[in-house]
Amino acid sequence: MNALTLPDIAAQASRQTLPLEWVGMCGIALPVVINNQPSAAKADAGVSLDDGEARGIHMSRLYLALEMLEQENLTPALLRRILQRFLDSHEGLAHSAYLRIQLDLLLKRPALVSPLAGWKSYPLSIEARLKNAMFHVELKIDVPYSSTCPCSAALARQLIQQQFIEDFANRPLQHADVLAWLGSPQGVVATPHSQRSNAALHLRLDDFIDELPLIALINDAENALGTAVQTAVKRADEQAFALANGQNLMFCEDAARRLNLALRRSPGINAFQLRVVHAESLHAHDAVAESRWNWEA
């Protein structure tokens, strides 16, 4: 009995001659290696189908090429090799290749004062394209932080001043009395509203960069804002966090400008756009600001 040849329907001609901009797979579960640590990720992989007479692509070839991601540290060079393999396995069919990797980047972050540390998750998307020998990599990173409203802080200070006048009117001021008052509930009769906020960064990397500057970018963003969300804390850390918020009062406009100026100085960045969202505790809506640099709209 002769062995039957398995049919390859994708290699057949299409009944409708029409090229397609993108064909591939989305949501592929796989491990990737970042900073020499394996991480669970999801990948979208595809190519253009430029041969309009071809019925389809060979998705299994894309899938198998992704095995390279679990074998070595994720770098722009590795991404380019994978995309080139996409194209080599579809010679005559495709001229462009695309790969997106999504994961939560886990970084251990130190406390502000104490020796404690804890893990913080940063949603990350890495997008790579190869077309006509032109290679591009873009990063999308979410950076959480705390924002305290400058207007609310001014109003709170005014209420504290008024309370001070009421409590010390027509009284000689004694250092010990004022110090005790400042440490009492009357001394903090009002507090400004603050909220957890988020900076969504979309960055285009230089074409010939050797490494993905993930940690450096996150550090630059958090240093510019000054109020990074914390992990494990003691009371001394919480006090330092309160001080950081008081010294970095921010509208969403302030946060966007700080990030813009900081990211311009970050090495390896060719262009970026960003969006900051302050999930207002005063209002039922968000305060939002956007900014970009060297980015074609």
Swiss-Prot record:
Keywords: Hydrolase. HAMAP family: GTP_cyclohydrol_B. InterPro entries: GTP_cyclohydrolase_FolE2 (IPR022838), GTP_cyclohydrolase_FolE2/MptA (IPR003801). It comes from Pseudomonas fluorescens (strain ATCC BAA-477 / NRRL B-23932 / Pf-5). It catalyses: GTP + H2O = 7,8-dihydroneopterin 3'-triphosphate + formate + H(+). The lineage of its organism: Bacteria, Pseudomonadati, Pseudomonadota, Gammaproteobacteria, Pseudomonadales. It comes from the Bacteria. Converts GTP to 7,8-dihydroneopterin triphosphate. The keyword Hydrolase applies. This is GTP cyclohydrolase FolE2. The keyword Protein transport does not apply. One of its GO terms (molecular function) is GTP cyclohydrolase I activity.
